Amino acid sequence: AFVLVLSFFLFVPDGRVPKPEKTGKTIDLRVETNKADLTALINRYLREEKIKGKVLLNDEVVYYGTVGVFSEKMQYKMTFKPKALKNGDLVLKQKSVSLGSVHLPVSYILKFVKTTYHLPKWVIIQPGEKLVYVQLQNMKLENGAKVKVNEFDLQHDDISFTLGFPK
């Protein structure tokens, strides 16, 4: 016991216990997931927010929805290529859009979605650029946490986020 106490005082200057280093304004946790689990989480969020449609993550992001055409409901499909940005946000570059079996101009459908659906403020649709900008850092979580995407490689099922909790 004497050796333990002596070594403590030898390695701690002035006999004071070092304080933990402050690493920033948040406590960061890295979360790794897979396509199947993230697909389930996204679809749960869509249901809770009453956003009609479903997402499927395979080698790309696929969104399925329905739209009224005359008196009929038709299913549409949008495919996106995701890209994680260094600031923690996510860009979804639109690859294709189809309504039933008809392929439509991407910018037209994105403009339709932007004006028709009530999307969260942190989802920015840019029809002219053919992309959806997902500002994850502006997403409001109940506990004040912030989300940043680290990796979003669907082909290799390598998906990770950092959750930053306020101190």
What are these regions (language model features)?
Residues 1-167:
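Extracellular/lumenal and peripheral-membrane lipid-interaction modules
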